[in-house]
């Protein structure tokens, strides 16, 4: 399981980009912290989620994510 925003999620094996799209996030309007490191948007497609990972997704509000 991957902990995303404090909640366990069955997302191992997906890239950050795939997870964001499936969860309905606009990748242009979020910041992602992955195992205590901020990812650049260029890293979203190449970063694969694995069991034990901790991810925080922060939305920039201005109309919602």
Please identify what each model-predicted range represents.
Residues 1-65:
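Ubiquitin-like/PB1-type beta-grasp interaction modules and other compact soluble beta-rich domains
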């Amino acid at each position: 399981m991957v902990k995303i925003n404090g909640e366990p999620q069955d997302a191992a094996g997906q890239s950050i980009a795939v997870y964001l799209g499936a969860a309905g996030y606009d990748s242009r309007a979020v910041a992602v912290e992955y195992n205590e490191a901020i990812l650049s948007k260029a890293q979203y497609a190449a970063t694969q989620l694995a069991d034990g990972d901790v991810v925080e997704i922060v939305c920039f509000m201005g109309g919602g994510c």
